[in-house]
Amino acid sequence: MPSMPIHSEDQYTYKLSVIVAVYNVAAYLDECLSSLHRQKRTDVEFIVVDDGSTDASSAICDQWAARDCRFKIIHQENKGSLLARKTGVMHSSGQWIAFLDGDDLFADDALEHMCSLADNCDADIIQFSIDVFNCNNKDQHDNILEYVNKPEKILKKNDTICASSFQKKSISWTLWNRIYKSSLIKKSYAHIKDVHLVCAEDAYTFFIAIFFSSKLFIKKTTPLYFYRLNTGVSTSRETIDLFTKHLSEITIIEHIREFLTIRAAEKSWFDACTALQTTLTNIAVYRMATLPEKDLPAALSLFFDTYDPVVYLPTLQNVFSGRQDTLACAAHTAFKQKDVRDSQTAHQRATPTEKKTVGIFYHRYFNGGVERVISQQIPIFLKLGYRVVLFTEQVCPEKEYPLPSEVIRVIVPDSYAQGRASIFLTALREYDVDVLCHHSASSHLLLFDLLLCRLAKLPTVLTRHETLAQDMSVGADYPFTPPTIFQLADTVCALSSSETYLYQQYGVNARYLPNPISVSAHEDIDAPSATGNRPTVLWVGRLFDLHKNYKEALEIFKKIIEHRKDVLCYIVGSGESREQNYIQNFIKIHKLQNNIVYVPYTPHVDRYYNSATVHLLTSSSESFSMVIAEGKIHALPLVTYDMPWLELLKDGKGHISVRQHDIEGAADAVLMILNDSILHQRLSYEARESIQPFLEYDLAGAWKEILETPQKIQPGVYQGEAPSNMRLLCDHIFSMYREGRRNTSSSFRTKEYIKQFMKNSPLIKRILPIGSRRREFVKKVVKNLYHRIR
């Protein structure tokens, strides 16, 4: 090789400088530097920066410098690849700059092509094509090439380049597949912070470079650069040590924002920076998801300290949707280790206020038992002197329960992908919420709502309106919330003592607390209800056949009417059109128009309790059934499917229980009460007596204690290191349930796809009415067709 370089026509000594940052890549470095040595051009220099390598890399660099005068070696203490490149750039003398990683290669004629591009393309950044090697996965190989290699185009404005790279992601932010004018890249590095960085340094440098650029030329060439896969920090198998290193990459966002602020950049640049923040955060979530479970608590602890929950919660929800119990256990351990609860709340008030503010969340405020509970809970909180903020996802003024004027209403999105975290958190801070009462314990968003509150250091009280048995019994496509998630709440209010005991075995701070029962509903009812002129049987509930069994209620009504033609039966509740159509068709087919009346949702259900003779309940599972409570308030004898865990039924008074799904038995029990006035009177008085302890319960006092000290550990909460025998048994049951759900989930999804097709097609609705034989035949055809396509 010649000993003297060929000078360019301007002030630069060389046509092109190649910067090679080296750190502990001895296994690949010789091959890398050899690819430079084979370049035929002499008007180039190779600046190799040894960034404090502890292997043989340093010696290999020196050997090549002795062999080829184009190599210039700089040895420095370890500063990270960002500053290693910066050192190389600032020591370069070329008109153009190219980058080569120490484990990658240049094509034999790469520099010839690069210099030709520099001479013939009027741009300050020129992109060329690359290839990937050491990759056994064709899809991965093709994906990288699709991301890096792009069709020829010219981007003439720097903000266009920025949007293309960081928002549209139509071009990569990698440094090594481009050459840069030396003046541009040196100016860029002059504004880059001297920070130790081994990840995302390309994004940082490229962002600053395009800010100062005026044109990027993308050229389709033969591969000039060969990218070695599965050796660098960004492609290595994730470990907790690597994950910790990766955490430093998010710091570039702060540096970029500072850079943009100083230069009073336009909003579009800040938007691009935010998009980059989201991308880096999402990458970190995916990396964390690949860690062994034993490392997840430590990773989460670091992650929570580093990243913004508003940015990462949507991706966290997406990535861990099928591993929520794993994430919950790891998060609980992480929070426990960090002891975040000892610090002050994250959102400080501008001025102290005497009133405590309580937030209440449920997805809606109409049409349901939980909503009715909340409508009765709000006056209790107001009477205690608290301010109340009601959070819901839906709003329907014409159907909602009355809301006191002093209650603040906030609507939040029903998805983290739609900005739920930001809107929720902003409102919690704006209204100085001191504690959040969350009523949606079976929501697929519960875990992430609890994480958001824990990270904001906001105490949460979770009310569990369902039972675990209910969740596990209604089908594989129904949300099942493992008790481990409840550990993230400060207090869990369960509606039965048996559920309370179960949660406590998981270390959940659970306590039994009955639902509020409206005073207005019972204050004027001092005697058993009269049967009236016509015996009446009442069924109240949502038309959700999965565990309310309204279809079985209709069959029970039919059998009762066969024996008592004078009986009037009411089925009161809301449901989708198909459920309502089913009821109407059932009544019509069996010619029961004079005996069965369907009443859609109404907030004035008391009038039906007042006129009823017997109350019927056909649920497979309930927790604290407001329907039972209201029936007992009205002194109605109850016939119910057996649910021995219910607090409202434990005393055995005021009701007759039959086996689950025993239609004959339920009909016989109702007829027995209708035909025996003495039995009716006894059960009626028992019902009134049975509800009395719940009416006298000091619910306001219990809630005041919870809201003032939500973190107070309740008696009975298991705090041992080793799991209790009860927990081990339940863990086994839950694991077997999940295994079974995985095995059947595809069949449930198939049914759901078919159901949606039949439901949403206008043509199908028109020519195939619900309940028709033709409709059932087409359903079978669609199902078979779907399986064939699968």
Where do the language-model regions lie?
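Membrane-interface aromatic/basic loop that binds lipid-linked glycans or pyrophosphate carriers
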Residues: A123, V285-E354, G720-R790
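Conserved acidic donor-binding segment of nucleotide-sugar-dependent glycosyltransferases
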Residues: G652-I663, M672-S677
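Donor-binding/catalytic cores of nucleotide-activated saccharide
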Residues: L105-K220, Y225-T244
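Glycosyltransferase donor-sugar binding loop
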Residues: L390-P397, V540, L568-Y582
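A conserved mid-protein helix/loop that constitutes part of the nucleotide-sugar donor-binding site
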Residues: G369-Q376, P535, F544-K559
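A conserved acidic beta->alpha catalytic loop
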Residues: D50-A59, G80, E576-R578
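Nucleotide-activated donor-binding/catalytic signature segment of Leloir-type glycosyltransferases, i.e.
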Residues: Y582-P600
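Aromatic "clamp/platform" in nucleotide-sugar-dependent glycosyltransferases that forms part
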Residues: S620
